[in-house]
């Protein structure tokens, strides 16, 4: 089953039948319009390309505009692709949030909030060094980053200070709390990556 592109609206809470508060993220999923159907014969694999939302005509490049016109759909805020397995789709077809009506759990992919340059304590949850006992400068410093003449280098992948956030992150197996097809909303339990109004990709959970 394919996924859908949505917009992270924010977080709130809902109450179940027992009156228990459930923290949920609200994802607005407007109709996803099919802009291209890729086939095994023509493209080497089966997939559909979709768009959603709207974009000002002045913000659409000529190649993009031609692509949208060929598909017979309104220009959207981006293009995304989902692999297909036997499902039939047509150009211009609209796919709505109600495809998740019978789905129990979903995987949500987004771009995490950028935090800029961060030290090891914030970026990797390193513990801090002694506050006193002779330590006057190295309270939040990494400490040793390697050995001696052997191997004589710092290994690749060593956890160090650097850029934190602003990367693609997937949170798996989030419970679907509610599907509101009328208002085009999907409520999932817990937090999803990204800032408010950012694009997120919602797919049925692979581990469900």
Curated annotation (Swiss-Prot):
Any one annotated GO CC term: cytosolic large ribosomal subunit
GO terms classed as biological process: translation
Entries under PROSITE patterns matching the protein: RIBOSOMAL_L3 (PS00474)
MF (Gene Ontology): rRNA binding; structural constituent of ribosome
Signal peptide residue numbers: none
Key words of the record: Methylation, Ribonucleoprotein, Ribosomal protein, RNA-binding, rRNA-binding
Family, similarity comment: Belongs to the universal ribosomal protein uL3 family.
Record's subunit section: Part of the 50S ribosomal subunit. Forms a cluster with proteins L14 and L19.
Name of protein: Large ribosomal subunit protein uL3
């Amino acid at each position: 089953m394919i996924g859908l592109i949505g917009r992270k609206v924010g977080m709130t809470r809902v109450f179940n039948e027992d009156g228990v508060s459930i923290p949920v993220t609200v994802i607005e999923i407007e109709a996803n319009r099919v802009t291209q159907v890729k086939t095994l014969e023509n493209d080497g694999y089966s997939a559909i390309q979709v768009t959603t939302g709207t974009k000002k005509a002045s913000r659409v490049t000529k190649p993009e505009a031609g692509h949208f016109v060929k598909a017979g759909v309104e220009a959207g805020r981006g293009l995304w692709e989902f692999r297909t397995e036997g499902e039939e789709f047509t150009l211009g077809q609209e796919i709505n949030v109600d495809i998740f009506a019978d789905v129990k759990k979903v995987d949500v992919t987004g771009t995490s909030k950028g935090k800029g340059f961060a030290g090891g304590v914030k970026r990797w949850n390193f513990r801090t060094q002694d506050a006193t006992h002779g330590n006057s400068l190295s309270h939040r410093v990494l400490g040793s980053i390697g050995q001696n003449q052997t191997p004589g280098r710092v290994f690749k992948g060593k956890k160090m200070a650097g850029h934190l956030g602003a990367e693609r992150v997937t949170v798996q197996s989030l419970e679907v709390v509610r599907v509101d097809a009328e208002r085009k909303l999907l409520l999932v339990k817990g937090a999803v990556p990204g800032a408010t109004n950012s694009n997120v990709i919602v797919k049925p959970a692979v581990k469900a």
